[in-house]
């Protein structure tokens, strides 16, 4: 009986690996062709009627996108902008629903959206949808002149004014040299060239990212950002100057 069980497991492993060997090249070609079409203007991101700032990453795993979105939203609100946030609502019960966040429970909108709501101004509008273009257009119609895309780096269907990419300790992992499902990368590292700003997060866990860019900033966000509404502005540790002074 044990021999049969082992044989079945080996066959399952063989089938799984065979499927991955087939899927990986197809996935890689899709990423390459999609980016090529956008880079040469064959496909174009759609404008939504407001300035758009995307906060994303290039690897799987948490790099602090939501806390950074919170800090940026609060900074912009404080400086007179009407801010809207687009979130897919990861972990919510019904992912097909599209709605402006009001009094929905965490089950309806996802825990990340609740974190956004509890740590931003009451005037900041949050739209939950898988369709980022639709959500951003709705926020623009509601009077938002700046829309933040939470996790939007790979979503090129929407035109953006600023692309912010967060790099955490995950980016030092050897798995980051390979594309998912063989590694942690969502797309090859060469596509970081699309980023206007790269930010190193979780600096206490990072030795050296290897990036040598004038637009690379060391980011320090206090831990209270995850549990408190009193969020400090983000500063460049090298010069202590306030960030997010974008010409919008």
Language model feature labels by segment:
Residues 35-101, 204, 240:
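Walker A (P-loop) phosphate-binding motif
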Residues 3-10, 173-248:
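C-terminal accessory "lid"/substrate-recognition subdomains
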Residues 90-92, 96-208:
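Phosphate/Mg2+-binding loops and adjacent switch elements
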Residues 81-83, 163, 214-216:
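Hydrophobic anchor at the start of a short beta-strand
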Residues 84-86, 165, 242-248:
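Conserved beta-strand elements of the Class I
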Residues 49, 80, 123, 195, ...:
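A generic structural signal for alpha->beta connector loops
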Residues 2-51:
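A transmembrane-helix-recognition feature enriched in membrane-embedded lipid enzymes
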Residues 55, 167, 217-219:
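Hydrophobic residues at beta-strand termini and immediately following loops
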């Amino acid at each position: 009986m044990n021999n049969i069980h082992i044989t079945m497991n080996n066959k399952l492993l063989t089938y799984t690996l065979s499927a991955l060997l087939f899927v990986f090249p197809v996935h890689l070609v899709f990423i390459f062709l999609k980016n090529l079409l956008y880079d040469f203007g064959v496909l174009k991101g759609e404008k939504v009627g407001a300035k758009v700032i995307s906060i994303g990453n290039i690897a799987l795993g948490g790099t602090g996108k939501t806390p950074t979105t919170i800090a940026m939203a609060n900074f912009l609100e404080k400086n007179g902008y009407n801010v809207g946030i687009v979130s897919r609502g990861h972990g919510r019960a019904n992912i097909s629903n599209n709605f402006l966040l009001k009094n929905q429970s965490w089950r309806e909108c996802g825990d990340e959206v609740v974190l956004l709501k509890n740590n931003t101004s009451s005037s900041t509008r949050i739209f939950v949808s898988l369709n980022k273009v639709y959500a951003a257009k709705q926020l623009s119609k509601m009077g938002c002149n700046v829309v933040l895309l939470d996790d939007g780096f790979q979503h090129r269907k929407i035109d953006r004014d600023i692309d912010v990419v967060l790099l955490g300790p995950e980016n030092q992992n050897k798995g980051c040299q390979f594309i998912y499902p063989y590694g942690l990368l969502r797309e090859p590292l060469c596509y970081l060239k699309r980023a206007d700003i790269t930010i190193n997060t979780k600096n206490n866990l990072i030795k050296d990212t290897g990036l040598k860019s004038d637009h690379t900033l060391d980011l320090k966000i206090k831990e209270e950002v995850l549990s408190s509404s009193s969020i400090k502005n983000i500063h460049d540790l090298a010069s202590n100057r306030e960030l997010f002074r974008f010409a919008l």
